[in-house]
């Protein structure tokens, strides 16, 4: 089986973490994320030409709102299973509540229709004002 790095441009759903992914699926995707056999470097220059490693470390840093250097200091010398475990925990903590809310909202068709109607009314007002300004700028009069 060929392992691939997580990527939003890939067609496969297994290549990225989606907002609606549940806990088990997030863990599975992170476990299967491609890495190399070397341990995690403790300095940024140790990530040179280690794209998969850099990708996972970058995701961990971003989801936890910390610098890559801090991640390398924390995980340097350790194997990737340690980072993947912590990354899964962080992603689950951040993403699962969003997915739960999305699923809840998608079930409430009345609420969604109300939001769509409100948005349509706002867009209509903006469009009418823009059209009025355009007519004035180019010197046309609108016949009603």
Describe these PLM feature segments.
Residues 1-144:
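Conserved nucleotide- and phosphate/pyrophosphate-binding catalytic cores
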